Swiss-Prot record:
Source organism superkingdom: Bacteria
Name this polypeptide is given: Ribose-5-phosphate isomerase A
Free-text function comment from the UniProt entry: Catalyzes the reversible conversion of ribose-5-phosphate to ribulose 5-phosphate.
One MF term in the entry's GO annotations: ribose-5-phosphate isomerase activity
Organism field: Histophilus somni (strain 129Pt)
Active site positions, chain numbering: 103
A GO term from the CC aspect: cytosol
EC number, UniProt record: 5.3.1.6
Binding-site positions, substrate: 28-31, 81-84, 94-97, 121
Gene: rpiA
UniProt keyword annotation of Isomerase present: yes
Pathway info: Carbohydrate degradation; pentose phosphate pathway; D-ribose 5-phosphate from D-ribulose 5-phosphate (non-oxidative stage): step 1/1
Similarity comment: family membership: Belongs to the ribose 5-phosphate isomerase family.
Catalytic activity, as annotated: aldehydo-D-ribose 5-phosphate = D-ribulose 5-phosphate
Length: 219
């Protein structure tokens, strides 16, 4: 079974957690695009969605789903998003699509974070296969990069990418993240960092994995 089929399988399985008349938090990325597509099939049963990126907002509107601002809601039942890596503790690296800050904002509004992935995203240690994205205020880029080198990382500027918030991304290689919660806190305390792509303080509650054998749900 190919990767896209596994993503679609996980996205379809996430529909069982969508409650009637609710507003859904929606992340961004290729697996979430599959979820938005299937969410369109039940759009008459929900009030709408809060999107974590402009790209997801456009896809939701194209499906005929009303999009609300995060400022319009006091909370969400669920937030559905993918991950670039996820460990057995349901902690993640996210930000391959440069939407990490808004993803953290919308995830923080939700009672339940449902992570949908294909099996290739499962790792034992975060940072094993994917660089850690960090959103940085442009004027602090070099300063933050030096700090990341001092912490043992190898940062690379993601060229020609500007986030929805007008900032830049540094992708940090060679970080084996043994203590994700402490690393998330430490990196967020670096002056000039908006946020980093470790989702450990707010990890997933439910993980839906598309595998060649079928859908696996980890609660």
């Amino acid at each position: 079974m190919d990767q896209l089929s596994m993503k679609k399988m996980a996205a379809q399985a996430a529909l069982q957690y969508v409650k009637p008349d609710s507003i859904i938090g929606v992340g961004s990325g290729s697996t979430v695009n599959c979820f938005i597509e299937v969410l369109g099939t039940i759009k008459e049963t929900i009030k709408g969605a809060v999107a974590a990126s402009k790209a997801s907002e456009e896809l939701l509107l194209r499906q005929g789903i009303e999009v609300f601002s995060a400022n319009d809601v006091s909370g969400l039942d669920i937030y559905v998003d993918g991950a670039d890596e996820i460990n057995p503790q349901k902690m993640m690296i996210k930000g391959g699509g440069a939407a990490l800050t808004r993803e953290k904002i919308v995830a923080a509004l939700a009672k339940k974070f449902i992570c949908i992935v294909d099996s290739s995203k499962q790792v034992d240690v975060l940072g094993s296969t994917f660089a850690l994205p960090i959103e940085v205020i442009p004027m602090a880029r070099s300063q933050v990069a030096r700090k990341l080198v001092a912490l043992g990382g190898s940062p690379e500027y993601r060229e020609n990418v500007v986030t929805d918030n007008g900032n830049v991304i540094l992708d940090v290689y060679n970080f084996k993240i043994m203590n994700p919660i402490e690393m998330e806190k430490e990196l967020n305390n670096v002056a000039g960092v908006v946020t980093n792509g470790i989702f450990a303080l707010r990890s997933a509650d439910i993980v839906i994995v598309g595998t060649p054998e079928g859908t696996k749900i980890i609660e």
